[in-house]
Each structure stands twice: as C-alpha cells, then as structure tokens.
C-alpha cells in the first residue's frame, strides 16, 4: 500500500482517541502462566464437539479464569442465512454483560451505521450453574450479519480521504473503528463493563467466558455447530483482575482470531509501538496487542504473511546469515521498523482467519525465536484432511480420536508430526494451513513461513477402518503356520516376520494376523511375546509397501489396547497362576492389592483417570509399588501427568512401559528405574533425574531433563526446545 494511504488510515484513528485518558504507562491487567492452546482445520466442516475434547484434556493448563473458542468457515443453513450473506456480510458478535444494555448498544452503534441482514441471540443453557467449568455467569451474545450503509461509508471515505482505498478495505476499517467506540463506551478497561465486541469479520465467531474453554461448547450449545477451523484457549492468569470474560482469549482483528500461550517481557514497548500508530489497547493483555499488531500489519501495511511473521518473530544471528541475500535486505528493513514492536519473551500464537480476497480460510502457528513455549504441528492427509496445532501432542491426539469417531475416513494417527524452529532460515518458526477450493472441493495445503510445502509421506492405500471383513478373513496356511511358530519364540522373531510381510499382505491379512496373535496369547509367555512384537511394530520404522504407515500404526495400537483389556483383573479369581499379568482401571482401583503367586506385571488402564492428584493413575502406580509391584504397563493415557514420580530412591528393579498419550512430568525425579515411552512424550520430561534409564520412541517436548543429574536417556525422535538446562 502507498505510504500516503497508510498515513491516512493511521490518521483516521486519531479522533478515536480524543476523549481517551491515557495513563502515563499502559500496564498489563494480568500476568499469564503456562496456558493451553489448540487449533485444527478440516477440509469438511466439523462440529464444535471436536474442540470440546482437546479443551477438556487441557483442562489443567487453565485455572478457570478464562476460556475461549473461535471458529471460521460455517455452514450457512445452520446460521439461518444464505451462502451470499455468510460470505459477504460481517458477523458481528457482541457480548452483553447487563440484561438491559442491548437496546442501547443497537441504537448507538448498530442500526445508525449498518444494514442488518439478520440478527439473533445465541442459544444458551437455562442455568449456567449446571454447566461444569464456569466460574461466573457468561455474557449473553447477540450475532448480527451487517454491512456498512452506503451513505455512512461514503461519508467515512470522504472525511478520511480514502477515495483511493479499496471500498471493501474502507468498510473493514469503519467496522474496526466502530467496534473500538463500542468497547470504549461500554467496556472501558478501568470503568463500567456493560458490553464488548467479541469478534468482527466475515464468517468468523469468537466466544469466551470466565471459566474453562470446554464449558463454552455446552453453555452456548454449539456441539453440533460446524465450521472448517476451530481454536481454543485455556487461560492461566497468575495475578490481576480476572473476573470478566473480555480478558480471555481469543482476541479479534478484522476477519481473524488469535490465541496465545506466553508472556511478553516488553508489553510497554509493544504498546508504545501501537500508540504511535493511534492504536490503543482496551483490554490490557499481551494477547490483545498481538492481535492488534497482526491486524495493523495485515490491513494497514498490507504485508504478506511471511513479512508479518518476520516483523513479529525476526530472524537473527546465524539463521539470518544463512538467508538468501535478497531476503536479508528486506528483512533488515522490516526489523528496523518493527523491532520495538516485536514481542519479546516466551510466546506461541495460534491464529485462524478468513482471507476473503483469496477465498481461503487459514490456521497458522507462530513460535517465538527462542522456542520458549511448547508447540507441535500435525497433518492428517486423505479423502478428508485435517491440520492441527497445539501446545502439546496429547491435545492433537484427543482431537483426532474425536474426529475419527464421527468420520472413520479420518485416522487417529496423523501422517506427520513436527515442531517449528523459531526464527530459523529453514522454516521461519511458523506453519500455515490453507483451506481453499480445488476442483469443487475444499482441500488443505500446509506451508512454512517461506511458502515451502510441508513434505508428507507418499500417498498410500487407506484402510477401511469400519470394514469387518478381517474378522472372517481366512489366512493362508503358510501365514497361519508361521504365526503359530513364531508366537512360540522370542517376540523379535515374530516382529521380524510381520515386518517383512507387511508390504505384500493386504490390510485384512494384517488385521487377521494381529487378531490371531491376541486370541492365542493365553499364558505369560504368549502374552509377553505378543506385547513385545506389537510394541516393536508400534515403535520402529519399516517399509509398509503401498499402505499408509499411519493406518498400520493405528491398527497396531488398536490391537495392543484390545490385548491389554483382555487381561484378567486383579479381582478375577477364575484365572490360574500361569498368567503374570493383572489389569486394573478406574472402576476397579479399590481392588488394588499386592502381587500374589506368580503375578509380576500390573497393567493400568489410565483412560478416564484424572490427570493429576490423589485419584490419578500416577498415584495408583505409586500405591501399587508400595504394595510390592515392580513392573508396570500404563496404557490408554490421555494426558495423565507424573507417571513414575514419587516412588523414592533405589528403584532399580522397577520397570514401567507407557503407551498412548502420556502427559507432563513423566519420569521426573526417578532414581534407578527404567521407563519406556512407546509414543511421543510431553513437556517437563525427566526433570531432576538422579539415576535410571529413560527410553522414548518418539519426540520429547519442552524443558526436557531440566536439572537432571544422571541417567541413561535414549530419544528416537527430536527435542522441541530448551533441553538439558
């Protein structure tokens, strides 16, 4: 955009500030701890219940002082409008904090300026106290589909000399300034709080509460509301006034919503950068100024997405030196202009936005240059595509499991999981999922900051997960005899035979073989061989021929879970002494006792256990150790924390195998034991280890081995950031 038009847009905001009393220093309202953020996009619209599951699983990343959800790309029929209105009109969502404020807000800020095609109050629960996870009554929310009246927009353009500005861009700016006025009158940060704008943009919605994010789904009854992208935030403010929902994330810009995990060290500097451009923060949070920065560079400066990211997370040092020369010159200019407005400190953004001029929806994640906050990306390719971003992998796992229950074309195991490298010359510390129409269907492509596509495994043959033909599938006699032969040997023999055969087998062959192994595993030897072979199939890399590796892994994990669940419970008295394995779950936890006869392995089904506390699976494992158990298998994990903690010193004879989606702080403080993680691990892994052995057949998250004093550590995947401090 030409510099004189940029100046005019900035100057047009001056009158907004005429009656604003500026404090000498604009300070944040609250400090924030380690929040939880998650987002996903789908090539087909999917229901709000699928953002509920990862939000609930990240419940302990919030403290009930703020939760929020945003969505982009709706189904017009669900909103009671036409496709034309949905795509062309702004969706204006206003939170009403007092019962009698609606008429006044409409009279002063809506009907004088906008043509309203439709409006409606959002449905809500009859009694907010019946919805778990709410701390105060959420606001009533009214949704308006609006366009600026022609005569109003003409006057706005003339007054601000916007004749050379695209008319739709001028309308965007009017909408933005009108929302500022509404907020200033009805929700001044230090004054009365009656109403505020939740979101303003085309085909986008933001909802937020004082409480937890998952409560929004039930309170506003959006379980079945469908959209192409969803993001959520669990807030963890650590000080300040946090009893109003406006401070919760996401924060809005025109056509965008942003959530944030972290805390700026230079909030005042960033605010000054905005004030110099006549942009005044109203809600006094890091996340608000982040959204304002992004909106400024996107709409006013017309920066490309690459250059917006560079301004917010500048490339530096060796990475800068490795950039192409043409980028260095431009990046130097961007950094010189925006360095004082570049967020400093630990942060990770997830942004969803509508890009109407490209007929595109976007979901993107940006990490700070030092990667000081956890982040993970994933992509599930196929007939239905899913792109995912989260502050922890277990939230991504929860999303895919939820989606797959509704649509079996979606595999619970993604094709690829990866991390961004902040401020790097390789990926720029950001990845973008673009959802746009291709040959009449919505499809997703994923690129890094520089526009380089993310490489995915070569497309393979998908498994029909709902097919049950494998249940009656007749294996040829050679396969059947080999399975019987190798099942009686070491698990390595069995694994090698299956591994070498997978490329030539059909999916039905593979599933029937897995099932046969489980069904024939009756005694300790057979069960151990099956668990060992399945674990290696889950952990190791091997050729799968024309099949999808992610589908093979899902089938293995499904069968392994079936095997674990088939084991006898602790209180099952009908099994003989030939089986060393005993099962316990949440419902049977009161039957915990010490090992009897030849029992030696306690198998804990962690599903449905709380993630932490006295009733957690980690606490159960500790109690079991005190009663004499030394070998453990933990499966069905959905983010449970502290596995292996609290067992005390000299635990050399303790062995723990962990499957599925374990949570933070696993193996922290161990002294001698062996823990094997048969999947990716999470954050705060292995802190203050004294002695022992830790094996991870996947990636590890942030703050890996903080304060560790010893031990043997093996990681097959990568370490996302800040290990070994």
Question: For each predicted feature, which ranges?
Answer:
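Long, distal/terminal scaffolding or interaction modules
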Residues: 467-725
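Conserved short alpha-helical segments that host acidic/polar catalytic motifs at enzyme active sites
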Residues: 1-478
């Amino acid at each position: 955009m030409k510099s004189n038009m940029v100046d005019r847009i900035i100057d047009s905001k001056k009158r907004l500030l005429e009656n604003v009393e500026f404090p000498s220093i604009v300070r944040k309202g609250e400090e924030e701890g380690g929040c939880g953020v998650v987002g996903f996009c789908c090539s087909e619209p999917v229901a709000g219940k699928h953002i509920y599951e990862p939000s609930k699983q990240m419940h302990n990343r919030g403290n009930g002082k703020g939760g929020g959800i945003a969505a982009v790309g709706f189904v017009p029929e669900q909103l009671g409008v036409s496709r034309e209105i949905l795509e062309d009109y702004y969706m204006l969502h206003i939170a009403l904090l007092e019962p009698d404020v609606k008429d006044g807000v409409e009279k002063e800020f809506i009907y004088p300026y906008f043509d309203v095609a439709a409006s409606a109050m959002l449905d809500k629960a009859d009694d907010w106290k019946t919805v778990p996870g709410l701390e105060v009554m959420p606001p009533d929310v009214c949704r308006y589909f609006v366009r600026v009246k022609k005569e109003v927009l003409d006057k706005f353009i003339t007054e601000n000399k916007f004749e050379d500005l695209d008319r739709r861009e001028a309308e965007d700016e009017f909408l933005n300034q009108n929302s500022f006025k509404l907020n200033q009158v009805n929700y001044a940060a230090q004054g009365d709080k009656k109403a505020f704008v939740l979101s303003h943009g085309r085909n986008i919605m933001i909802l937020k509460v004082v409480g937890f994010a998952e409560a929004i789904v039930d309170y506003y009854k959006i379980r079945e509301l469908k959209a192409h992208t969803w993001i959520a935030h669990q807030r963890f403010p650590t000080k300040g006034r946090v009893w109003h929902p406006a401070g919760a994330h996401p924060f809005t810009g025109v056509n965008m919503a942003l959530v944030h995990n972290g805390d700026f060290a230079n909030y005042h500097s960033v605010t000054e950068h905005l004030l110099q451009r006549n942009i005044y923060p109203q809600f006094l949070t890091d996340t608000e100024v982040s959204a304002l920065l992004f909106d400024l560079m996107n709409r006013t400066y017309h920066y490309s997405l690459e250059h917006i990211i560079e301004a917010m997370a500048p490339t530096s040092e060796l990475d800068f030196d490795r950039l192409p020369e043409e980028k260095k010159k431009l990046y130097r200019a961007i950094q010189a202009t925006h360095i004082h407005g570049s967020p400093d400190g630990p942060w990770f953004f997830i942004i969803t936005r509508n890009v109407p001029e490209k007929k595109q929806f976007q979901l993107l994640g940006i990490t700070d240059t030092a990667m000081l906050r956890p982040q993970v990306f994933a992509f599930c390719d196929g007939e239905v595509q899913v792109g995912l971003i989260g502050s922890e992998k277990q939230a991504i796992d929860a999303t895919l499991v939820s989606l797959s229950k509704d649509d079996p074309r979606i595999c619970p195991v993604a094709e690829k999981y990866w991390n961004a490298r902040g401020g790097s010359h390789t990926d720029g510390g950001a990845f973008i999922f673009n959802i746009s129409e291709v040959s009449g269907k919505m499809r997703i492509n994923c690129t890094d900051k520089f526009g380089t596509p993310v490489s995915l495994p070569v497309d393979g043959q998908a498994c029909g997960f709902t097919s049950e033909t494998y249940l009656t599938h007749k294996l040829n006699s050679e396969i059947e005899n080999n399975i019987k032969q190798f099942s009686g040997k070491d698990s390595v023999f069995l694994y090698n035979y299956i591994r070498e055969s997978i490329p030539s087998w059909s999916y039905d062959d593979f599933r029937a073989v897995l099932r046969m192994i489980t069904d024939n595993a009756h005694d300790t030897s057979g069960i151990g061989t099956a668990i060992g072979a399945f674990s290696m199939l889950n952990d190791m890399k091997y050729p799968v021929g024309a099949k999808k590796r992610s589908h093979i892994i899902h089938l293995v994990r499904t069968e392994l879970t079936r095997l674990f669940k088939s084991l006898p419970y602790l209180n099952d008295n009908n099994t003989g002494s030939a089986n060393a394995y005993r099962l316990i779950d949440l419902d049977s936890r009161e039957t915990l006792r010490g090992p009897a006869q030849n029992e030696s392995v306690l198998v804990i089904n962690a599903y449905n256990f709380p993630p932490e506390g006295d009733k957690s699976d980690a606490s159960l494992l500790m109690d079991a150790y005190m009663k004499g158990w030394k070998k453990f298998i933990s499966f069905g994990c959905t983010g449970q924390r502290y596995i292996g903690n609290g067992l005390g010193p000299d635990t050399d004879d303790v062995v723990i195998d962990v499957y599925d989606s374990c949570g933070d702080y696993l193996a922290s403080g161990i002294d001698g034991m062996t823990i094997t993680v048969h999947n990716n691990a999470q954050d705060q892994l292995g802190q203050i280890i004294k002695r022992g052995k830790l094996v991870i057949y996947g990636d590890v998250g942030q703050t890996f081995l903080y304060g560790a004093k010893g031990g043997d550590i093996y990681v097959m995947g990568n370490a996302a950031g800040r290990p070994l401090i």
